[in-house]
Amino acid sequence: MSAENSRSEALLPLRNLWNSVKCSRDRVRDGESNDSSGTFSLANFWEILNEAVKAVSQEATKLSLMFSKPPLPSDEDCAKMGECVQKSVLTLCTVYFWLPKSQGVTLRRSVRDATAEVLEGLVQLLDVILSSPGQSLSQEQLTSTGSVWAACDHFDQIPKDNRSAVLAVLSSCVGLVKDALEEMQQALAESQDPFGDVLDDDDDDEGGRGNQDRYWSASDRQLIGQCEGLLKASAASLRKLSSAVRHNAQLETEQEIAQLDDLADAAAHVSPCVDDLALSLYPPVDRAAVEQNVCRLAAVLKKLLDITRSSHVCAEADVSWVEFLSGAVEHNLEKVRSLLRSDS
């Protein structure tokens, strides 16, 4: 048998492992949880899951060390190593699938993404090892090993219940909306039309202003000012909802947990709508797109506030801000639409 054939045979367990880990990763991304029956202990789940994650990290370290310098491990050692890694991966996947949706879809999504990230890191590590087996430890292999460690360590930071998972989603939404609003305000402050002092917006003579596609006109700025009110209402709605969830959210019943999921799903639609509106406000301003995006954002905010009002996180003291922001959304929507009608 040639040296090349011998090496290929020795690496066969790793190729099989690579395929198996890829399949496990895809199953985690796409698969459903097992049916829950009886009592489920979230505390026990986390204890067992953390042990499973630790085992994957340890096996990845052993795998990387085994292939950190020549010569190649023996066929037997490769096979044993593959079995150990495979066992740790199957254990991790099995434990993940224990988590039922009744504990919260948002929580489960967070655990799913973290689990898939560990498996993706392992796939990348195996890719590197298989592409250059028997060579000295490369920077690429070090980086891939570190990525597996980082993905495993990330489990310490992920939410441990659905309330925390929903708060994490809301915090991300608040940050994204805040960034979009600040970018728009900064662009307005920095953008000046160098011809604005000598040519007005109505100058459409041939050979006149050729820079209107890059600067806001006075009417554009007026429109943006009205739209800014809706953007601020978006940020305020998400901040107030975050506070209500932080102080009032309960996890005693499946209905309460499901209501939190509904809030997270509704909130997740706000940021993309804010981005679409903000982008349509950059020059050249497309007023038809602005109207479409304003209406879409207002509808998303109204739905979010309606879901908030009917959920258990809306205490008696919260009704006033929900009603105020609902009115603010409607008021800003009408102001923008009125301005667009007057411009047409």
Curated annotation (Swiss-Prot):
Keywords: Cell cycle, Cytoplasm, Nucleus. Coiled coil: none annotated. It holds the Pfam family GCIP_N. It comes from the Eukaryota. It is found in: Cytoplasm; Nucleus. InterPro entries: GCIP-like, GCIP-like_N, GCIP_C. Residues 191-215 are annotated as: Disordered. GO terms for cellular component: cytoplasm; nucleus. Belongs to the CCNDBP1 family. May negatively regulate cell cycle progression. This is Cyclin-D1-binding protein 1 homolog. The gene is ccndbp1.
